[in-house]
Amino acid sequence: MTHASNTHPVTELTKELIARPSVTPLDEGCQTLMAERLAAIGFNIEPMVFEDTTNMWARRGNEGPVFCFAGHTDVVPAGDLSRWHTPPFEPTIIDGYLYGRGAADMKGSLAAMIVATERFVAKHPNHPGSIAFLITSDEEGPFINGTTRVIDTLEARNEKITWTLVGEPSSTLKLGDVVKNGRRGSLTANLTVKGIQGHVAYPHLADNPIHKAAPFLAELSQTHWDNGNEFFPPTSMQIANINGGTGASNVIPGTLEVMFNFRYSTEVTAEILIERVEALLTAHELDYDISWTFNGLPFLTGEGPLLDATRHAIRQITGYDTDPQTTGGTSDGRFIAPTGAKVLELGPVNATIHKVNECVKIDDLEQLALCYEVILEQLLC
């Protein structure tokens, strides 16, 4: 095992960002560091603070088209510190990998974006169009006061983004082997099935909501929602939480609470899913309350300049072709896509994200910056 320093500019900036313990929704000065670098190359910096969330909109240029790097400075908690090989907020290079919370998700991407932009502007100081950065500290948290609020602000003044590259860790086995050119929609239900609480010895004096709901839940879990399409897998429904009872063995509960989530394709809409679920509840003659939370619409970036530029960049820098996919969880791209912007995600290998000993290959950081730079050249030169 070797512990070594590294002078790659992307690695050094990534280390500076990791050293700031920006557990969501904290930013801990990450955006200030980024803003200083961007201001030095002609960006107008516009901080946008909403409640406990720090956001930044930075832009260089006043004309279209607008290419936007999007990302987040917040990270998930480190978890059990005893399971980390090195302190999570003390960036350490071991055997060619940089360890630390946020190394892959997504401070490495942020550093690559900054360095790529610095290089691009140095070569093309009078580039056409505009380059922008949309950065938040509320991606890993409730995503209430982050990207969605910045987009609301931009939309209110009719400031449009043409293309967005999100730095989420899209890669699976090696850098750039997968890019995300879309995401499924996400819809969450909070269901309360009502019964009558009572003693288990006197079931005729009570009404057990668990027994009543069981056939409904069985049918819900076995329902086929759609077949998906060439871009999206079939819609999936998963029960995430069930809670009922007092904890005592002799009490029939009065209510049953169930939370379930849909990850849905473009073959259905949230409205269709809601209608089908509520029809199923009615068919099972349940007494219920239900509330719905829209977490994001599905989006897809098909063939066009952004996907073409990204494919070209990955092929040029890595020597292999990328695979555009729409699988996985949601990202802040879901808040940007409804404005009409084309959205794509390209970032490091995601094998260690949200885990102890999160790490990124340092050679990948430099290659990622080169990919980002080529994408800028393809779209703005």
Curated annotation (Swiss-Prot):
Provide the catalytic activity annotation.
Answer: N-succinyl-(2S,6S)-2,6-diaminopimelate + H2O = (2S,6S)-2,6-diaminopimelate + succinate
Enzyme class, top EC level, equals hydrolase
Q: Name one GO molecular function term.
A: acetylornithine deacetylase activity
Quote the record's binding site residues for Zn(2+) 2.
Answer: D105, E140, H354
Gene3D superfamilies per UniProt: Zn peptidases (3.40.630.10)
Active site, UniProt feature: D74, E139
Classify the source by domain of life. Answer: Bacteria
Cofactor comment: Binds 2 Zn(2+) or Co(2+) ions per subunit.
- Role this protein plays: Catalyzes the hydrolysis of N-succinyl-L,L-diaminopimelic acid (SDAP), forming succinate and LL-2,6-diaminopimelate (DAP), an intermediate involved in the bacterial biosynthesis of lysine and meso-diaminopimelic acid, an essential component of bacterial cell walls.
**What is the protein's quaternary organization?**
Homodimer.
- Protein name in UniProt: Succinyl-diaminopimelate desuccinylase
Species name for this entry?
Shewanella sp. (strain ANA-3)
